Every structure is written in C-alpha cells, then in structure tokens.
Amino acid sequence: MPFEFSPLKLVYGGEALGYAEGRTVLVPRALPGERLEVESVRVAKGVVHAKPLRVLEAAPERVSPPCRYFGRCGGCHYQHLDIEHQVAWKSEIVRETLKRIGKIAWEREIAVHQASPWNYRNQAQLKVVQNESGEVALGFFEGESHRLVPIDECLILSPRLNQVLGQLRQPQWLGRLRGCREVELLANEQDNQVRITLFGNFETGEPEPLAGDLLSQVEGVVAVAFCDGQRTRVFGETAFTYRVGEYQYQVSAGAFFQSSRYLLPEFVTAATETAPGDIALDLYAGVGLFTLPLAQRFRQVIGVESHPAAARDLEANVRSHGLKHVRAVGQPASDFLRRFAHKEPDLVILDPPRSGVGKSTLQYLIDLRPRSVHYVACHPPTWARDLACLLSRDYRLEGVEMFDCFPHTYHIECLARLVRQD
C-alpha cells in the first residue's frame, strides 16, 4: 500500500533514508526535504525498501535527469540531483561514515576533488543476455537485479566507448555474441584506442574470425581478448597501455585499472605526495599506478599485488621504465608483511578492494611500524573500520580527501593520511 515519505538524508548506496511509523525506510531517486508517495518493495533486517511513485513536493536541488535510462539502468543513482549537491552530500557521507563506523569525529575540512560530470568513464562492463527466442541484447542491468536494460548510449562513458557500444549493438555483431555473458570495453587516456574483452563460452566456434572482424571493422579497436574462465587469448595489440602523467602502464585483460579518466593524475599525486625517504611499500599495487611515481621520492620501493594478471603487469611496468630500485612482488599483502624484515618503512600506501585490509593484515602492518600510511579506498565503510584500528594503535589522522571520480553515482574514492605518533 502506498504511503507518504519525507527523507532526512542521503546514505552510502545511493538511497535516501527516513522513517515512517517507527521504521527505517530507504528509497532510491528521492531527496532530503521532499514529500513523496512511495510503496514498499521488500523488508530486510527491519528496514523497509520502497520505490518512489510520485514526488508530491520537490526539493529545489532536484533536476530533470538527462539520461532516458535513468531509473531503470542501475549505473547511476543521482542524476536527479544537481552536481553541487551531489558533491556536498558525498562529502557528508564520508564524514558520517567515519563517525558512525570508525567512531572518528573528523571536524576538519575534507578536501574535495571533482571530475567533469559527463563522459568520464574509460571502462564499461556491458552485460549480454539471450532471450528464449535466441535474440541477443547488450546493455546494463537494472539496479539490484539481473534484468537487462538495452542501451544505445551512456552519458558517463567516453565518446569513443559510446561509439564502440553503438556499433556492437548492430545486429551483425549481437548475433555473434551468443555464449558471451559480459563485454568489457577499455579506452586509453587519449580515448582513441579501445580493447574489447569478451567473457564466456562462445557458441560460434573459434574466436579468431570474430576478433579479426572486430579489429578491422570497429573503429578504434586495437585489441580483442577472450576469457572463458580457463585462459585468456588476446588478438591485436597484446600489451594495451594507459598513460598517466609521465608513466605508461601496461594493463592486461583481467587486471584492475581505475575507470575514471579525468581525475587520475590528481589522484596519483595526492596518494603519493610525501617527503622523500628510504623505503616505501605500495600494497594492493595493481599494475603499479602508485608504485612507479613513488620511485621519484624513495631509494627503495616495493609494489605488492596478488592478482596474477595485475602482478605480471606490475613487473612489466617496473621493468619497462628501468626502475632498478623498484621491486614487484606477486603475493598477498598479508603474506608479504608477515615476512618483511625491514621495520619502520617511511610510507605504506594501502589501496585494497572493497572488503578492506582486514584485521590480520592490519596487525602485521602495525607491527611493522611505518612512519606514514596513506589509505586509499573505494568503499568508505570498510575504510572507516580499518582506520579505527590504526588510530587505536599509535597513529594520528592528518588529512582526509574525497575524490568524486564517478559523478551521478554513489561511488566515492577516499584518501586518509596517517602518521605514527612516537
């Protein structure tokens, strides 16, 4: 049954939170201060998840979403909110998360870095769905579902990725994607070269003919990779590269790389900026986004990465830049820290996955007693949890920064700078 709802605030996850009849209510595409008519969709752990039916009284910061798929496609969450208020709310969410989860009352400024709000993504994960009649569709899933929304363009993808997407949606290509479950597109920093990675088991035979046709007929495509869960085969340019500042990074199919192109140089500078020293560790290093720039400031740098493809790229990137004082280590951060003998490194950079660092790895890190820790995170809740652990063990929080790398979504990149208190 529909009921009236007035949200109080936005929360991490892209929804608006409020209360009705003593129960917590979460509603997407709603704004604080509005009056809406909503309807319950489900109740989980005592929280009512509802959908908006009508806006009865709109907030002044509400805008008309420019994307015709907004509200169905699960990619964006805030296109109904003007960009200034998006950034303000994200900053408040970072502060509130520190307080609620980390019990950290950060009263000082949160430095905010903003990206251009459109065409900023250099990467897309497109879903492929085949219906009962055998027709293949390409697009994004609806929020919290596996229902496909076929799309012609995405306003947050780079122009080149939109061009490739438009071509792949043509019938001659869709029919050749049977057996594929996901198509990943990655554009380089100039947005003039694209790698297509196809995930799945293909029903159309060997991949060479499809790869050859994609390379020759889709403008901008320079590499095509096929991943079937057992192995990865690459056609075209086997070493796809992405330049950030003065460094060129090899990024293999399956290796993680930042997907927001506009803030990358600023992001790298902020994470690596520190006084010169002897030893720096870059844990969860990926392909070496922070590892290589650290080489300018430290006599010895060690990048640690456990993902096989990313670890190989890390080693290749260190080697290609001739950095003799930089070492690439392919193992989990916890294993490396447990065996690392050099106490008190000058700097440790943490950039873990959404799950965070975790207790045991944090304990190994604390035992190592680094002088400074820069903690980069894409998931504020686990970031705040881990920061609380560090702050309870002789570390002081010196600064907090927020990077709005993904406008119109709830996603946030955070940076915390900590120093050891002797």
State the predicted function of each range.
Residues 53-65, 71-180:
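Extended interfacial segments that mediate partner engagement and assembly in macromolecular machines
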Residues 118-122, 190, 410-411:
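A short, glycine/Asx- and small/polar-enriched loop/turn
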Residues 110-117, 182-186, 227-231, 401-405:
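Short, solvent-exposed loop/turn elements at beta->coil junctions and helix N-caps
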Residues 39-43, 127-131, 186-190, 419-421:
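Short beta-strand micro-motifs enriched in acidic
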Residues 1-69, 145:
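Terminal RNA-binding accessory module
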Residues 147-182, 187-191, 202-225:
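Internal alpha/beta scaffold segment
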Residues 4, 12, 16, 175, ...:
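Rossmann-like S-adenosyl-L-methionine
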